[in-house]
């Protein structure tokens, strides 16, 4: 009688399945982004008048030809994001027949990193490179020159307004419609007089009610007016009145969603404000703003394939994209699992069926809870200190990324503190129970440490390779909303190595903490509950600061000066899911390794790469508070 063979899930099988899964996700995302092959997507560069290169992505419906010209839209991203972060707008517009161009601003993403003077003051920088993309579009023979629009979110709105000014000065303006997302319109001319700087262009505004950056104004006596009162402001009244001086207006009511019309230079022109009960970054991943943008340009131009803006498929693209990222992380885990079974890396292999240690005794539990709460409390205190002292707002020649400086300093501070608490628990409790630094995996031979470095490097490269393939083969990054990973231009890689030490300290420290010091049950919980507990504990500081900050902001209309500074809470939203995912990845990697360095180096490196690849870079000493 033949015995039935049991199916055995191996590391090699896991690696193969992870590769196949990630590939399927990338293919699915690309198919959705290209409207199943009906839209040609290509990435190229254009030059500003200052001679700097701007990376742009061009979405061209294949039905657009020199005989069948299509309307076009240029989309400007916000500060410290990239063109990939707004792919949903390009997807929805291009599948409706619009040519769409999404540039990386100068000093962002794949574009050149320019000096301070070029980025901020040089008119030849072409509005951070955005107007260079407009000029590029105007030269495409399959674009209708009478139907070119521009849209920008946040700082991209600033770039949009600057592009309009440049267009006005060009002598041959090509922009005929403008949309601003969570960004102020231009209300006055260069002399400070109320004016219609947009001329006979259609202009729409997506007004985010809980916006902490834009829409706040002042009364005539200089008193601040919150963004939540924007619709009652003189600025809003002037906008819907096509630049008229508010003092000359009587009984003007700004009604969100209402279309205001006027005839300017023989053309019927519209102004519209769409009110959204959203926070400032929501349009980076929200359906409402996408619908508003699509409907606005379909109304302003002749839409080749009209479909109401609320009909959207980009969420499926976003799902495929983020699943692709999890697939890439799975490739990393199973790469490590597979290689530790080889002869060369066998000395780094974890013991068979590695399990969490039993729960500690009463003394151990007291030690665990005190130190765990201390780690959590220190995260609150350290980020407050960083912002209170102004360290959250600076750049230097050597540390040129303001946003990264926040997370780098926070990672370093928390990493050092976790090392103190982890080794504190060792000397106070663990060694009295028979633990040693060798049993923790902290004390290893130099040979094994060097092998660990090599294995960790392979793990990091397995993920980064996926990012480059995703970018250059499938024209996507791997993300959901604010959170994701993309490749870096090779000439920008020095930024990764500049910030790597900060994140390595954090990654290794957290790994020692949860994979050595606290690699045990708390009670009788299953392993996955234990993993989720540590993931939750690492998420609490960022989540609490974000929630409290936005709650108070929603109540008062003004940024609360808590946790060190008024803007602290606005930066913490980016960290909310990142830390728990990092913890879960550390735990998964630890199942196959006998020391905490391999998971720590991998996670620290990936956190660093994720952070530095997308944000604003400027090599100068500057305070951005």
Predicted regions and their residues:
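Short, Lys/Arg-rich N-terminal segment immediately upstream of the first membrane anchor
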Residues: 1-11, 355-363
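Hydrophobic H-region at the start of alpha-helical membrane spans
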Residues: 11-21, 324-328, 371-374, 413-417
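Soluble extramembrane regions of membrane proteins in the secretory/endomembrane system
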Residues: 38-313
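Juxtamembrane/start-of-transmembrane alpha-helix segments at the extracytoplasmic/lumenal side
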Residues: 311-325
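Juxtamembrane interface at the cytosolic side of transmembrane helices
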Residues: 326-373
């Amino acid at each position: 009688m033949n015995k039935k063979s049991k199916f055995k899930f191996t590391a090699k099988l896991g690696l193969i399945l992870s590769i196949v899964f990630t590939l399927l996700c990338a293919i699915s995302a690309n198919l959705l982004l290209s409207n199943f092959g009906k839209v040609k997507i290509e990435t190229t560069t254009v030059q500003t008048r200052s001679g700097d290169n701007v990376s742009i992505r061009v979405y061209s419906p294949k039905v657009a030809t020199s005989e069948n010209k299509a309307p076009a839209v240029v989309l400007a991203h916000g500060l410290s994001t990239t063109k990939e972060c707004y792919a949903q707008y390009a997807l929805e517009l291009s599948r409706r027949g619009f040519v769409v161009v999404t540039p990386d601003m100068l000093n962002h993403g794949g574009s050149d990193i320019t000096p301070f003077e070029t980025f901020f003051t040089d008119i030849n920088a072409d509005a951070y490179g955005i107007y260079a993309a407009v000029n590029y579009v105007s030269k495409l023979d399959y674009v209708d020159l009478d139907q070119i629009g521009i849209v920008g979110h946040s700082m991209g709105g600033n770039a949009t307004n600057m592009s309009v000014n440049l267009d006005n000065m060009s002598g041959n303006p090509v922009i005929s419609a403008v949309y601003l997302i969570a960004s102020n319109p231009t209300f006055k001319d260069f002399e400070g007089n109320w004016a219609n700087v947009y001329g006979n262009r259609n202009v729409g505004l997506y007004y985010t009610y809980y916006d902490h950056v834009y829409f706040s104004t002042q009364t005539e006596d200089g008193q601040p007016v919150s963004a939540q009162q924007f619709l009652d402001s003189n600025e809003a009244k002037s906008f819907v009145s096509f630049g008229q001086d508010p003092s000359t207006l009587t009984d003007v009511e700004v009604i969100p969603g209402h279309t205001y019309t006027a005839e300017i230079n023989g053309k019927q022109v519209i102004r519209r404000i769409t009110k959204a009960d959203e926070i400032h970054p929501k349009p980076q991943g929200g359906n409402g703003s996408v619908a508003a943008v699509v409907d606005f340009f379909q109304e302003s131009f002749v839409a080749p394939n009209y479909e109401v803006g609320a009909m959207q498929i980009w969420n499926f693209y976003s799902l495929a994209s983020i699943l692709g990222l999890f697939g890439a992380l799975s490739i990393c885990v199973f790469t490590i699992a597979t290689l530790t079974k080889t002869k060369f890396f066998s000395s780094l292999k974890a013991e068979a069926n590695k399990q969490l240690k039993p729960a500690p005794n009463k003394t151990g539990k007291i030690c665990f809870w005190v130190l765990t709460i201390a780690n959590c409390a220190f995260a609150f205190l350290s980020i407050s200190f960083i912002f209170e002292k102004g360290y959250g707002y600076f750049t230097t020649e050597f540390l040129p990324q303001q946003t990264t400086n926040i997370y780098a300093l926070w990672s370093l501070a928390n990493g050092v503190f976790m090392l103190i608490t982890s080794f504190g628990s060792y000397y106070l409790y663990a060694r009295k129970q028979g633990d040693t630094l060798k049993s923790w995996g902290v004390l290893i031979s130099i040979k094994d440490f060097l092998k660990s470095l090599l294995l960790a490097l392979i793990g990091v490269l397995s993920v980064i390779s996926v990012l480059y393939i995703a970018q250059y083969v499938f024209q996507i990054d791997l993300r959901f909303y604010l959170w994701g990973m993309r490749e870096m231009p090779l000439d920008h890689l020095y930024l990764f190595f500049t910030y790597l030490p900060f994140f390595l300290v954090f990654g290794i420290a957290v790994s020692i903490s949860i994979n050595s010091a606290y690699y045990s049950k708390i009670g009788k919980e299953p392993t996955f509950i234990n993993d989720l507990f540590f993931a939750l504990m690492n998420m609490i500081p960022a989540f609490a600061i974000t929630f409290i900050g936005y709650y108070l902001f929603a109540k008062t209309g003004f940024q609360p000066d808590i946790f060190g500074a008024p803007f602290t809470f606005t930066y913490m939203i980016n960290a909310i899911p990142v830390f728990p995912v990092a913890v879960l990845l550390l735990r998964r990697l630890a199942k196959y390794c006998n020391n905490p360095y391999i998971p720590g180096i991998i996670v620290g490196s990936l956190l660093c790469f994720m952070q530095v690849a997308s944000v604003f870079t400027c090599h100068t000493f500057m305070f951005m508070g």
